[in-house]
Amino acid sequence: MLNNAMSVVILAAGKGTRMYSDLPKVLHTLAGKAMVQHVIDAANELGAAHVHLVYGHGGDLLKQALKDDNLNWVLQAEQLGTGHAMQQAAPFFADDEDILMLYGDVPLISVETLQRLRDAKPQGGIGLLTVKLDDPTGYGRITRENGKVTGIVEHKDATDEQRQIQEINTGILIANGADMKRWLAKLTNNNAQGEYYITDIIALAYQEGREIVAVHPQRLSEVEGVNNRLQLSRLERVYQSEQAEKLLLAGVMLRDPARFDLRGTLTHGRDVEIDTNVIIEGNVTLGNRVKIGTGCVIKNSVIGDDCEISPYTVVEDANLAAACTIGPFARLRPGAELLEGAHVGNFVEMKKARLGKGSKAGHLTYLGDAEIGDNVNIGAGTITCNYDGANKFKTIIGDDVFVGSDTQLVAPVTVGKGATIAAGTTVTRNVGENALAISRVPQTQKEGWRRPVKKK
């Protein structure tokens, strides 16, 4: 069906006392992203014309965390219920648009479910998201007559008979803007909590002869809210299990799906293998036949075909061409780039550095602000000294250079093609092509020398 224009209201004013945190509840993260950000993203994907965020506690923290989102900030100075929260946003509703109500602490609601709810909303009526629970204790019950929804009764206000109802309200609903404003103006706080319930608009709509259509989510986890860290951790595992299942069905071999975390977006080729306890953050692309060892963290990086990343390696904002090998225990920091067939071994760190085709840095090395050519050997213990305490400087190493172990290259410095740097050398001046650079202290040997003896 053809949908009206739609705006979304996200309720995010709660303090989250049971989180025992100085951070507003909705800013606690699930899969590396604030819970409320999941909801904002869903609203935007659904095509919301406006997103109204109702906030209360921790407003400054919320505005700082969500500064890049195009939000209309609506203050709820007193937390007097969900109906009161919606009343604060009501002046911003257009009469001819639909208003979808969501919650900042219900992070896993899917766009697919919301679209079905939107499509199901009857003209002049309400679309309501409900679920059936074996134990509905504590939740508002859906009342019906002859199968038609007539209202919602909160648990504290329900009779014993009503408490036997298993269909409960999720709090998510959609209605026309003009209707919503009219119903919100009629709300009272005559209930056990002394609050203004948004759920009372269901009975108001029914009294006007309006139709209320109930829709069920695809998964219960979509409508589960978070009030404490235990609930958040459970939803985290639900989310991660769903992501792992999608990847497995798409051909990615996860050695143990229960020990894999996706905290962003993973684009992948064929025959990718990921071992246990791997974390993927941000936007990551893995080419064909990539292998990632246990304990690795990959963030905002592109890994080319046939690359192998050995255990306990951290890769962040890096680009690897085909057939590179890294680790174990290596660290590629932002700006690291490996060309085809390059190798970075254990305890090697790279930052804003390029390692050319077939070049190798096998172990115990720091390469920062460096441009390294093809077929270069970087010996163990090599350090590019790129920082003078105030500014960073660049090291340039040409093709086919051999850098011996325990070498320091004091930037800015250039080493020409084919040069050799002897082990233990401190390079402070440019080295010409095919030259040998050596700066060792001359070795002294004392024959018959005896070690000191400790005095008694």
From Swiss-Prot:
What Enzyme Commission number(s) apply to this enzyme? 2.7.7.23, 2.3.1.157
Say yes or no: keyword DNA damage present: no
In which residues is acetyl-CoA bound?
A380, N386, Y387, S405, A423, R440
The record's cofactor note says: Binds 1 Mg(2+) ion per subunit.
Q: Could you tell me which residues belong to the region Pyrophosphorylase? A: 1-229
Residues binding Mg(2+), per UniProt:
D105, N227
The reply to whether Transport figures as a keyword in the UniProt entry is: no
State a single Gene Ontology molecular function: magnesium ion binding
Instruction: Show the active-site residues.
Output: H363 (proton acceptor)
Superkingdom is Bacteria
Pathway field:
Nucleotide-sugar biosynthesis; UDP-N-acetyl-alpha-D-glucosamine biosynthesis; N-acetyl-alpha-D-glucosamine 1-phosphate from alpha-D-glucosamine 6-phosphate (route II): step 2/2; Nucleotide-sugar biosynthesis; UDP-N-acetyl-alpha-D-glucosamine biosynthesis; UDP-N-acetyl-alpha-D-glucosamine from N-acetyl-alpha-D-glucosamine 1-phosphate: step 1/1; Bacterial outer membrane biogenesis; LPS lipid A biosynthesis
Which CDD domains does the protein's record reference? GT2_GlmU_N_bac, LbH_GlmU_C
**Cellular component per GO?**
cytoplasm; membrane
Q: Which reaction does it catalyse?
A: alpha-D-glucosamine 1-phosphate + acetyl-CoA = N-acetyl-alpha-D-glucosamine 1-phosphate + CoA + H(+); N-acetyl-alpha-D-glucosamine 1-phosphate + UTP + H(+) = UDP-N-acetyl-alpha-D-glucosamine + diphosphate
Q: What is its biological role?
A: Catalyzes the last two sequential reactions in the de novo biosynthetic pathway for UDP-N-acetylglucosamine (UDP-GlcNAc). The C-terminal domain catalyzes the transfer of acetyl group from acetyl coenzyme A to glucosamine-1-phosphate (GlcN-1-P) to produce N-acetylglucosamine-1-phosphate (GlcNAc-1-P), which is converted into UDP-GlcNAc by the transfer of uridine 5-monophosphate (from uridine 5-triphosphate), a reaction catalyzed by the N-terminal domain.
Similarity annotation: In the N-terminal section; belongs to the N-acetylglucosamine-1-phosphate uridyltransferase family. In the C-terminal section; belongs to the transferase hexapeptide repeat family.
This chain's protein is named Bifunctional protein GlmU
Q: Which organism is it from?
A: Escherichia coli O81 (strain ED1a)
The gene behind this protein is: glmU
